[in-house]
Amino acid sequence: MPLNSYIFFLFLTTSPRNTFFGIRTHSDRIMATEHITRTGDEYNVELLPSDDDAPPLESSWRLNLDAFQLPSSTGGRHDGRTRFSRYFRTPRKERRVSEYYKKQERLLEGFNEMETIHENGFASGVPTEEEMKKLAKSERLAVHISNATNLVLFVAKVYASMESRSMAVIASTLDSLLDLLSGFILWFTANAMRKPNQFHYPIGKRRMQPVGIIVFASVMATLGLQVLLESGRQLVAKSGIHMNSTEEKWMIGIMVSVTIVKFLLMLYCRGFQNEIVRAYAQDHLFDVVTNSIGLATAVLAVKFYWWIDPTGAILIALYTIATWARTVLENVHSLIGRSAPPDFLAKLTFLIWNHHEQIKHIDTVRAYTFGSHYFVEVDIVLPEDMRLQEAHNIGETLQEKLEQLAEVERAFVHIDFEFTHRPEHKCN
């Protein structure tokens, strides 16, 4: 199948059930007609102008998106209702069609992004070197502020734990202790990444990010297990807490202040894209939840029933284990070489084909996680009689374009003169 057809075949065959697409290719122009059956009626939607009303297009080796457009009605209504209410009020088939077109809109946006790289020679929105330095400085500031605040709040919560002797408050305090330990782990990771060593780490230290986060999350999940066991022991022993009014006021004041500070830090750290700073944001959000539960259960245990306090500690422990176990799984996936989603591979294919007229075939397009970003491997076929200098320049400029994408850490472009050979790499 010609590559022109392949790109849009991938683009169009993600349609919902009971939807049929006919594809016709005319030079570099691709026509697609959709037939959707809804409530017994059949109608036609032309995603591209028909031959009669379309302006003539010049023959070109490039994939052209100028004539492509989605229908004005995408099968879904956007009348301001919440997504939750639309889910129950909108017929299932209409929801599927609407979701399908939203996916196509996102894919078109990705293709337009690739077009921008072809036209301008660089990706839009890529920060300059000066902007990158300022961003790195602000990220380091966010890490230092978080660590210093965690130290101060830990001291305050130790006092609250001593005054209240609440298991839920103690669980929250132990969480703050581990915040300091985990903060040191993340700081060490970020600091190590800023010191490149081309001899020991020839492709950089970016994989230290997910490794540091996995260690961080593992320690937090271990804390949750310990608190769970201790709270269960208290429930079996039927041991409650006792506080006078002064101790209760001190505990409430400290825990409320800590929760407010953590909430503000969470909002601050969420504004960054760096994975380590966002891990701090997740930790601050976790502290807001655990502090709120710890305070509420401690006060309720004093006012009403003793068992509310260890029950609250168990809830905190379960939340801790679930949250950080999910974080571990997410970062493990980024280290094991998981393939990029089909939409991203389609963007890469579009970029590669439009790179140069002499590219006759695209043999391989592969992208997989290797840390927080993707490694990309591309095999392209050039004319066998092409000069080495010209072939090298085509491959090198394509590599530079691929590495401009924010999701790509490193790209490898392999040049060949035919595509009927056996696999060139060992597959385990």
Curated annotation (Swiss-Prot):
Annotated transmembrane regions: 141-161, 168-188, 210-230, 249-269, 288-308, 312-332
Principal localisation: membrane
Topological domains annotated Vacuolar: 162-167, 231-248, 309-311
PANTHER family documented for this protein: METAL TOLERANCE PROTEIN 10, MITOCHONDRIAL METAL TRANSPORTER 1-RELATED
Segments on the Cytoplasmic side according to the record's topology features: 1-140, 189-209, 270-287, 333-428
Function: Involved in sequestration of excess metal in the cytoplasm into vacuoles to maintain metal homeostasis.
Domain of life: Eukaryota
Designated name of the protein: Metal tolerance protein 10
